[in-house]
A protein has these predicted regions:
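Core AdoMet radical
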Residues: 56-75, 79-103, 118-131
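Distinct, well-ordered alpha-helical segments
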Residues: 103-111, 132-142
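Sterically constrained small-residue positions within well-ordered secondary structures
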Residues: 20-22, 84, 115
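A short, compositionally biased domain-edge/stem linker segment
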Residues: 12-18, 34-37, 77-78
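Canonical Radical SAM [4Fe-4S] cluster-binding loop centered on the CxxxCxxC motif
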Residues: 21-67
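Short, Gly/Pro- and small/polar-rich lid/capping loops
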Residues: 1-22
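N-terminal cationic-hydrophobic initiation segments that often serve targeting/anchoring roles
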Residues: 76, 80, 113-114, 140-143
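Alpha/beta enzyme core
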Residues: 110-117, 122-123, 138
């Protein structure tokens, strides 16, 4: 009646889905592209949200100002200690609102991440009020 999901669950987990596709676990690599958000820069508010403490989930290799490629390479080295057999990664644009920039800048950053040979996809953390139709159309065009 239910599909045979690998973890013995009756739903499809994110990790299980990728494990079936790639034959292994995928690891997210946190990328800090130097974004801010409208609740920090004064457009909506100042100081940010109480739940958005990036220092709590910001690994040492993820530093704004470093290239995306350098952050990916250093992230792979960092995670290889624990996950030696992982060969495929997701570039996770995590800090603040990662669509809070003009589309040409987003295309540049996301394309740099997607061009890395070990990166099979991107994950984008953002606010819904920082995404417009133009950005969604471009993201939908990615294969």
């Amino acid at each position: 009646m239910f599909p045979d999901f690998p973890e013995g669950k009756r739903y499809n987990t994110f990790a299980g889905y990728y494990k079936r596709i790639y034959g292994e676990r995928l690891q997210k690599l946190v990328i800090d592209a130097g974004f801010t958000c409208p609740n920090r820069d004064g457009k909506v508010g100042r100081g940010g949200c109480s739940f958005c403490d990036n220092a709590a989930f910001h690994p040492g290799y993820s530093v704004p100002g470093k290239s995306i490629a350098d952050q990916i390479d250093e992230g792979i080295s960092f995670h290889r200690v624990r996950y030696r057999n992982t060969r495929h990664y997701l570039a996770y644009f995590q800090s603040y609102s990662n669509t809070y920039a003009p589309l040409p800048r987003l295309v540049e950053l996301y394309s740099e991440a997607l061009s890395h040979p070990s990166v099979v996809g991107i994950v984008i953390g953002t606010r819904p009020d920082c995404v417009d139709e133009e950005k969604l159309d471009w993201l939908a065009s990615l294969k």
